[in-house]
Amino acid sequence: MIVARDDQKLAKAKYLTTQAKDDELHYVHNEVGYNYRLTAIQAAMGLAQLEQLPAFIERKKKRYREYKEQIDRIPGLSLLDVPDYCASNYWFYSLLVNEREYGIGRDELLRKFQAAQIQARPIWKLNHTQKPYRHNQAYRIEKAPHYFDRILNIPCSVGLTDAEVERVLLVLNDR
């Protein structure tokens, strides 16, 4: 909790302690922010959830495979693969949209999800393009802008139901 007499300073503190996001959808950060919102109770619940982590990852892996089987049948769409040398936690299901083959681009597909009231999001803005980091050293990352413009994260909650997946697939198949 933050207490202040100055409303502007209070607003600034809240802004900085909630990641300093200026655009929730595209993860735009014009200042360096922090994520200082974990209470002791939330920390205890998080530790208790760790016991379920292997089962959660297994469910998310299974759902990823189900999505992938269907999405592989749609020209111009593909879920990013997990390389053989990696062990993924399947946190996100990142959909690569090839506009030429699919017929519409990532942003138009995002609007279709929004119209269907299904949450989907672009991947995070590239750090080296964010205002606080523009003047910092960055490695050569020639492929990153290509992927940034073409990836959409689709619903991937551990509690995702078959019916919800079906709704996502209906949107993907309707172009």
Locate each region found by the language model.
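Glycine-rich phosphate-binding loop of ATP-grasp-fold ATP-dependent ligases
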Residues: 1-2
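PLP-dependent aminotransferase class I/II
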Residues: 5-175
